[in-house]
Design a protein with these regions (language model features):
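Hydrophobic transmembrane alpha-helices and immediately adjacent juxtamembrane helices
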Residues: 1-271
Length: 271
């Protein structure tokens, strides 16, 4: 266990060291977060009505509802891109083959590659919410932070399975991933990101029930805007854990199979 944690830490420290050489990126991302929060605030002022507020979960403002949806889109993007990007960088730099012939296990390689991008995404989202709270009155007084952390953890587990599947596709086909963009498109419509799932046609509501994004957003909005406890959120948390229990083993098996296939065909390092 100590060796596993040390290896994961080394992956994280490597990525952090690389990121620290591009310090101006952090400044521009903070400015980008300010513009993003401002955009959602003024769009919400344009469309907010008492009728709309009553239709939203927790009866809050559209600004709070849409901002939570937008930052979760950032998490979904991170989950789907992180493993792809780490795999491409390791393959292009020639370190992938070296890693695979060492004692570094596949789960450690996958987890280590993901930890820094997820930490960076979390910090970026904290900046978004901070700007929104300081300048645009985003409501944080009803937040249950223990529930927020619990929902975030199970969401990352569920989303990671999707990201590893995406990386498996990249290993085999090398370029492009239409399945990833299809899932992002479906989630943006049938995931409850910018409007409630309840207003969708019945068939799209059915699609939403099979989408982990739906349950992640339901739970996060209840925890962040409605002071919901972990016990009160047992249903969406349990569903997200079920997604994780199914997707993580399947995705790891698929990723391992993809690696074996590329080794056999000799295309592991080919773009």
């Amino acid at each position: 266990m100590t060796r596993i944690l040390r290896d994961i830490w080394l992956f994280f420290w490597r990525d952090l060291s690389i990121a620290r050489t591009y310090r101006t990126v952090f400044v521009f991302e903070a400015i980008e977060a300010l513009f993003g929060a401002a955009m959602f605030y003024y769009v919400a002022r344009f469309v907010d009505t008492p009728g709309l507020q009553s239709a939203l979960p927790q009866g809050g403002s559209y600004f709070a509802f849409s901002l939570v949806g937008f930052v979760f889109l950032d998490y979904l993007n991170a989950a789907l891109d992180t493993y792809d990007r780490s795999l491409e960088e390791a393959r292009d730099s020639g370190t992938l083959e070296h890693l695979l012939v060492t004692q570094t296990s596949l789960p450690v390689f996958v987890a280590g590659s993901a930890i820094y991008p997820f930490v960076a995404t979390t910090l970026r989202i904290v900046v978004y919410v901070a700007w929104a709270a300081i300048l645009f009155h985003f409501p944080l007084s009803n937040a249950n932070w223990l529930s927020v952390f619990a929902v975030l953890l199970v969401t990352l587990l569920a989303f990671s399975g999707l990201g590893i599947l995406s990386a498996s596709y990249l290993l085999i086909f090398k370029r492009g991933n239409p399945a990833k963009w299809f899932f992002l498109g479906i989630s943006s419509v049938a995931g409850g990101m910018l409007f409630p799932v309840s207003i969708l046609p019945d068939w799209l509501q059915l699609v939403a029930r099979f989408n982990p994004v739906t349950y992640a957003l339901e739970a996060m909005r209840a925890a962040l805007l409605g002071d919901a406890s972990v016990a009160e959120l047992w249903r969406p948390i349990a569903i997200l854990l079920l997604f994780a229990v199914v997707l993580l083993p399947v995705s790891m098996f698929t990723f391992a199979w993809s690696l074996r296939r590329t080794k056999i065909t000799g295309t592991l390092t080919h773009s």
